[in-house]
From Swiss-Prot:
<dbReference type="Pfam" id="PF00254">
    <property type="entry name" value="FKBP_C"/>
</dbReference>
<feature type="repeat" description="TPR 3">
    <location>
        <begin position="264"/>
        <end position="297"/>
    </location>
</feature>
<comment type="similarity">
    <text>Belongs to the FKBP-type PPIase family.</text>
</comment>
<feature type="region of interest" description="Disordered">
    <location>
        <begin position="1"/>
        <end position="44"/>
    </location>
</feature>
<dbReference type="InterPro" id="IPR019734">
    <property type="entry name" value="TPR_rpt"/>
</dbReference>
<protein>
    <recommendedName>
        <fullName>Peptidyl-prolyl cis-trans isomerase FKBP42</fullName>
        <ecNumber>5.2.1.8</ecNumber>
    </recommendedName>
</protein>
<dbReference type="InterPro" id="IPR011990">
    <property type="entry name" value="TPR-like_helical_dom_sf"/>
</dbReference>
<keyword id="KW-0812">Transmembrane</keyword>
<dbReference type="InterPro" id="IPR039663">
    <property type="entry name" value="AIP/AIPL1/TTC9"/>
</dbReference>
<feature type="repeat" description="TPR 2">
    <location>
        <begin position="230"/>
        <end position="263"/>
    </location>
</feature>
<comment type="function">
    <text>PPIases accelerate the folding of proteins. It catalyzes the cis-trans isomerization of proline imidic peptide bonds in oligopeptides. Modulates the uptake of MRP substrates into the vacuole; reduces metolachlor-GS (MOC-GS) and enhances 17-beta-estradiol 17-(beta-D-glucuronide) (E(2)17betaG) uptake. Regulates cell elongation and orientation. Functions as a positive regulator of PGP1-mediated auxin transport. Confers drug modulation of PGP1 efflux activity as interaction with NPA or flavonol quercetin prevents its physical and functional interaction with PGP1.</text>
</comment>
<feature type="region of interest" description="Interaction with MRP1">
    <location>
        <begin position="163"/>
        <end position="337"/>
    </location>
</feature>
<keyword id="KW-1003">Cell membrane</keyword>
<feature type="compositionally biased region" description="Basic and acidic residues">
    <location>
        <begin position="1"/>
        <end position="15"/>
    </location>
</feature>
<feature type="domain" description="PPIase FKBP-type">
    <location>
        <begin position="67"/>
        <end position="159"/>
    </location>
</feature>
<dbReference type="GO" id="GO:0005516">
    <property type="term" value="F:calmodulin binding"/>
</dbReference>
<keyword id="KW-0256">Endoplasmic reticulum</keyword>
Amino acid sequence: MDESLEHQTQTHDQESEIVTEGSAVVHSEPSQEGNVPPKVDSEAEVLDEKVSKQIIKEGHGSKPSKYSTCFLHYRAWTKNSQHKFEDTWHEQQPIELVLGKEKKELAGLAIGVASMKSGERALVHVGWELAYGKEGNFSFPNVPPMADLLYEVEVIGFDETKEGKARSDMTVEERIGAADRRKMDGNSLFKEEKLEEAMQQYEMAIAYMGDDFMFQLYGKYQDMALAVKNPCHLNIAACLIKLKRYDEAIGHCNIVLTEEEKNPKALFRRGKAKAELGQMDSARDDFRKAQKYAPDDKAIRRELRALAEQEKALYQKQKEMYKGIFKGKDEGGAKSKSLFWLIVLWQWFVSLFSRIFRRHRVKAD
């Protein structure tokens, strides 16, 4: 193991996860759950006789050159039936595409990617001749014969040939080192409030440590990889919370908690996202677990107080609502007051029972 890399990882340990207790507001991204191709109004750019592109979101910087290693997410559909047969966003694992060395069935996609900048999202139209051909593909992915395709593609970023080599040709030390550099670049961009660009760097860092790579690691190699990979997921979650994309933030926290179930930052950020979605009881459970593992954390105490205040405000609102209902029917009547307090008591009992049941279920799991 490269001793300098190990020292670098330890040196940056305190800086590896960004602090995000603020509430910057930036524009939201489109949903990552599309089952049909997006409707795009932009003019189609012809890239090849069989390939055209419509830009959904502009990128930044330069375009990749031949033999660049590109990291991207995409969804793919057959054009006629609009059957979605592949979705890398669903797996939360970007793919690697080396331009000029792509598989034959990805030739059309590669032409589209070569025309895109980092951060650009586009709808790429590919004729069957530059896709799965006359015979199609009957294993995975399942594509019928002579099928024209649609790709919704987002280029996360790319490495020029002069900067490095394909992940498969890298040693363990090189891959972890490359990922750590991307993570630190992401942290710098986050501090500048460039959230989308920061997430691209974190995604590229994660791309160096896919499931196939992590599966081969053990001992200190695994620990060093997780010390880079998990903070990237948490930092993406922090960006997504600022972008108000709460469901996606929860997904990245869940990935970390699969590896480290006692990670207080993952529990805290998941709780924060759940609270924003109105899942108060579940958010409280996450905050309390986080507090158990980080008892001195002021941010956790602050979120628990905020939840308690929200519940108190909701209780007062319900109280006033029921008062208004019964006041109209029986001004000052003893029966109305009794019924009101009976309803309030019943709601409290149901809420208490629900919490007890949830705690028992969590313990059982």
